[in-house]
Structures are given as C-alpha cells and as structure tokens.
Amino acid sequence: MNIRDIDHITLTVKDIERSVRWYHEVFDLPIIEFDDGRRGVKVGKQKINFQVADTPHLPVAKHPTIGGADFAFIATDPLANILSHLTNYAVEIVDGPLPKTGAQGPMTSVYVRDPDENLIEIGKYDN
C-alpha cells in the first residue's frame, strides 16, 4: 500500500454554519459544498468537513466528539503577522509562540481554539 497524503479530516461541531463561517473568516479558507449540501473548507489540497454529532452521513467515527480534535495548520506569513491577524479576529492564543518540530522540521507555533474548543496549532517553518 502506498499512502501519499491526507485528503480530509472531519470535525464534529455544534453548529456547522458557525464553524464554516469561523474557519472562512479567521483563516481565509474557501468554503466548499459537496455531497448534496454538506459544507466544509478547503485547506491547500485538503479539506475540513464539518458534521454534527448525530449526523445522518455514514460511516462516522465510533465516538464523534465535539471539541476532541487537535491538528496543525502551516502558515507562510511572518509570525508577527499571524499574531496580529489572530488579535484582529479576537482569537485567543492559548499557548506560544513555542519552538516545535513539525513533519518537515523545526517550526514556531501558536495554539488557538475554534468555537467548539478544538485545538489548532498554527506553525511557521523556520527555514
């Protein structure tokens, strides 16, 4: 088997429209629609799907949990711009900036939470 990438993640949220709007506004991610009205956002070549806990779409995770995700975005902007942007959108930084190691090497990261308390790392590679 040759796995080469991640296609999407699915976040279980309280309110799909609120989440779509927040990710679009805060991270400037394009909104997408698929499969008869499901909504998500595009992140590079990947996407984030949103579902509610009692979603009718199958299959789903065995224990879909609101606020149970922890994932990282990669940013290309200078760290000062990232911090300023988050402040402009009243997004609280819960940790960082911190030195971290991402899949491609050393990075500096800050951590925020979305409206459902999912933990989002925003990393800027040092190279």
Regions found by a protein language model. Name each.
Residues 30-36, 98-100, 125-127:
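Conserved catalytic-core motifs of GNAT/GCN5-like acyltransferases
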Residues 52, 95, 124:
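Pocket-edge structural micro-motifs
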